[in-house]
Amino acid sequence: MNIAANNRLVFSEEQGMILDSAREFCRDKSAISAVRALLESENGFDEAVWQQMVELGWLGLAIPEEFGGSGLGIGATVPLAESMGRYLLATPFFSTTLAAQLFARAGTSAQKNHWLPLLANGTRASLALLDGEDWGAKAFTATAEASAGKLTLSGEKW
């Protein structure tokens, strides 16, 4: 990926192929009626679509090969992110990719060996909690509660 003289992103051939398949996938999986339904759903994303993204290898694009990823680097996720934004495809892709980058760049060997394969194969995903207008809260409390095989996270920020 390069930036041309007119400040436009120019994708590599590999990124162009990812962009083409991502646009088609996101367009097909993200009809406006589906987006609206997901807003009201319990988990906010379609697990079948998530599983298809796993099968396409998209969760491991930026994860090193030794941990089950493709090792293509964070730049390989840009075409996918562009397509997901264009078509409003709701998944935990962004937060999971960011969590994987955190482990890859700053994790201990034990953390990398444990978490990166799970994130690459879709067994685990990450959340981004951006609810409400005040993203600059000074403090917060959070409680996670397990019940009937589900984890409920609740909290308060101020």
Which residues does each PLM region occupy?
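Short secondary-structure junction/hinge motifs that connect adjacent elements
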Residues: 33-55
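Glycine-rich, Trp-frequent "lid" loop and neighboring beta-strands that shape
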Residues: 69-70, 110-158
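Internal helix-loop-helix
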Residues: 4, 54-116, 120-121
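An alpha-helix initiation/capping motif
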Residues: 16, 43-47, 96-97
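Intrinsic disorder at enzyme termini
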Residues: 1-14
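Buried hydrophobic positions in well-ordered alpha/beta secondary-structure cores of metabolic enzymes
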Residues: 15, 26, 57, 64, ...
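Catalytic cores of phosphodiester-bond-cleaving enzymes
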Residues: 1-2, 27, 41
